[in-house]
Amino acid sequence: MKNLICVSLYDNLSMKAYNLSEVNNKELMGIVENAPEGTLFVFTCDRPNGSSVIMCPGGGFLKTNLENEGIDFAEWFTKLGITYIVFKYRMPRGNPDVPEQDIRLALKVVREKFPEFCDKLGVMGASIGGYLATFSATLL
């Protein structure tokens, strides 16, 4: 893995890049409850092949398991030249339209801000994140 780029989906699409050796994993990993905003964690490769995968972690729309169902896969994908993107979506608080809105925006942002990674763009998910991945298939 080369770098990590964090993109806030609702803060004017602000982006911040990190060298992975300087990242405090405690800020990124673990289980997030009541996420107020959507964020993309983009793990770049040393030799990107133009492909990327957006990972939608599970958590039953009550929390997001960023570590076990997200960031833990980054090294494997990036070694294959696949840019790996962990998608932290907002919690719906009973409204399933909220994460669906976020995945729509995430796909748009990835295509517009990172076209070099979008020759082949896939979405996968764990648990309820699998639902979001399936929903996103209707948008690709």
Question: Where does each model-flagged region fall?
Answer:
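A fold-wide structural signal in alpha/beta-hydrolase
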Residues: 52, 78-85
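N-terminal cap/lid segment of alpha/beta-hydrolase-fold proteins
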Residues: 1-47, 96
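Active-site loop/turn elements of alpha/beta-hydrolase fold enzymes
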Residues: 58, 82, 89-91
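Short beta-strand element of the alpha/beta-hydrolase
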Residues: 50-58
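Primarily recognizes the serine-hydrolase "nucleophile elbow" in alpha/beta-hydrolase
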Residues: 105-140
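Catalytic nucleophile-loop/oxyanion-hole region of alpha/beta-hydrolase
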Residues: 65-66, 72, 87-119
